[in-house]
Amino acid sequence: MLLAGAIFVLTIVLVIWQPKGLGIGWSATLGAVLALISGVVHIGDIPVVWNIVWNATATFIAVIIISLLLDESGFFEWAALHVSRWGNGRGRLLFTYIVLLGAAVAALFANDGAALILTPIVIAMLLALGFSKGTTLAFVMAAGFIADTASLPLIVSNLVNIVSADFFGLGFTEYASVMVPVDIAAIIATLVMLHLFFRKDIPPTYDLALLKAPAKAIKDLATFRTGWIVLILLLVGFFVLEPLGIPVSAIAAVGAVILFAVANRGHAINTGKVLRGAPWQIVIFSLGMYLVVYGLRNAGLTEYLSGVLNVLADKGLWAATFGTGFLTAFLSSIMNNMPTVLVGALSIDGSTATGVIKEAMIFANVIGCDLGPKITPIGSLATLLWLHVLSQKNMTITWGYYFRTGIVMTLPVLFVTLAALALRLSFTL
């Protein structure tokens, strides 16, 4: 287990620190090659791992391409300007609406899209309103926080969700029926915590006249309009076609192709730039990283965790839910949520849990891996990239500040969200 653990730690360090600009895909590939050479994993493990990650990574890339195309069309800025007008000049209402917009974007376009696309738009809008640096920081932190805490409701809302749903064969409707009400509880808890934490930084009023008209944000009307149609078709497709055996990735890919074709025909959007901006390295990263994680499984780590989960399972639904959720949240915060979700899934699969207890553990693993990364900056790749985007905007958030904020806000929200899950599953007993 020591060798497998050492390879895993080396891989995680390379992925997080990215020395000399080394891409996450190549870092994970190096780890996978070391695992293969050392015998920690075997050639036969490659197709097993690929079967776990292919649908998840393809779906994620398609959703991000859709997000980038809509962003270039002005879709998200248009939405942000509209919700800012709904605030009617009241600071707390504006704060609430920006958070709710972030929740909606996270649900439909994944947490990465919400954090990375909305953040620059929010910063630009707040600068136009003449807000102070402290106020801008409050809004930006809120946008970044809700992107993860509200990425629970749909399979496509987070790469973690897709991996877990694929691993356990959860259908789109089956997943949503459990997690949509849980997500609502998470959003309410997040709103309460954000308002409490940043209460002194939210201005009482703002001047609506300083905002530009939402229509002026639209750069490509055809892509903007098609985006609405694609979104509706995607949601219908996910709920109707996925139960028929059509992969979520295929449905998302069709949506991306339609929107790309419209954008490419209009020439207002640099579609080549959009394709270059898509996270292609996530394919190599997922395969490489999960091969390294599979090495931990082969070395017996997941067997040990399965033993811990067995103890929790014996104590009933609530203990299993809270125990699994807090365990995977902690692991996500120290070793990144992408490897953690597979470690959790393998451990649950190897446990003796059955029925609603196993179901609780599966969803608690997702919650822990979605929310746990907010405790530390290294918890998710999206957070690291988000911090980099902020530094480019002359808004540096130190790791110390992030950790202090993250731990105070995440733990109560995690508690409420896991309680909501246990309550939701109590109705299926």
UniProtKB/Swiss-Prot annotation:
The chain crosses the membrane at residues 21-41, 46-66, 98-118, 121-141, 178-198, 228-248, 249-269, 274-294, 316-336, 407-427. It is found in: Cell inner membrane. GO terms for cellular component: plasma membrane. Keywords: Arsenical resistance, Cell inner membrane, Cell membrane, Membrane, Plasmid, Transmembrane, Transmembrane helix. It is a multi-pass membrane protein. It holds the Pfam family ArsB. GO terms for molecular function: antimonite secondary active transmembrane transporter activity; arsenite secondary active transmembrane transporter activity. One of its GO terms (biological process) is response to arsenic-containing substance. It comes from the Bacteria. NCBIfam families: 2a45 (TIGR00935), PRK15445.1 (NF011980). Involved in arsenical resistance. Thought to form the channel of an arsenite pump. This is Arsenical pump membrane protein.
